[in-house]
A protein has these predicted regions:
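Short, well-ordered beta-strand micro-motif
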Residues: 3-5, 87, 106-108
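Active-site catalytic loop in hydrolytic enzyme cores
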Residues: 1-31, 44-53, 111, 115-125
Length: 125
């Protein structure tokens, strides 16, 4: 499990398919993280069904911000990725979303929010 210290908190790193394994995120959150990055290339088919739902679930379960850059567009004649780059808050709100195409998203964040929620709802035991 890879983590890094930032000036405003600790971040963990996962990739794409890792999103389907909640225990990995639980183990990361035990490292006192406030943020998790999930760069991904979900296909259009699975992305439409699961991408935002899984991002929000991992954020809520672990009270972490999720930063999710996502590949978008047709990569080969048979493979199209879903896109939908997102920033999700620790309570599951979609703070920023870029559905398709190149671009940059940003949002105000409250680094303390993760720890505050963990005190209010002590489910990460």
């Amino acid at each position: 499990m890879v983590t890094a210290n930032l000036p405003w908190g600790k971040i963990g790193f996962t990739i794409c398919f890792d999103l389907r394994f909640p225990e990995l995120y639980r183990n990361l959150s035990k490292k006192n993280l406030s943020f998790i990055a999930v760069p991904s290339a979900f296909t259009k088919f699975t992305g439409q069904k699961h991408w935002l739902t899984l991002l929000r679930a991992r954020a809520i379960e672990n009270f972490c911000y999720i930063f999710a850059p996502a590949q978008t567009g047709r990569n080969t004649p048979k493979r199209e990725t879903f896109g939908h780059t997102a920033i999700i808050s620790p309570d599951g709100k979609i703070l920023a979303l870029k559905k398709l195409g190149k671009g940059v998203i940003y949002s105000k964040i409250k680094p303390k929010l993760s720890m505050d929620l963990r005190k209010i709802i002590p489910s990460l035991i």
